[in-house]
């Protein structure tokens, strides 16, 4: 999502590079979906600085979010959306439930 949607690198180039490098495709991806405003509020309350990705422009981060949405539509069995707006307990439960489903396949 970061390279293709965020940075605008053509998808074919990224796929070719991943194939050439023999990067394995993940069996499961847990996508923590949180609105940008909420994510930044949480970061500000827990850390003093942003990392390189978090320091990107708002439009870059919005494109990355759209990329994850697109990937989740393409790979619904592999990418599980976790509603990160919920309480910590509910998020943890969503993660455990997703892992249980995955491990029991």
Stretches with model-predicted labels:
Residues 1-49:
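ATP-dependent NMP and nucleoside kinases share a basic, alpha-helical "lid"
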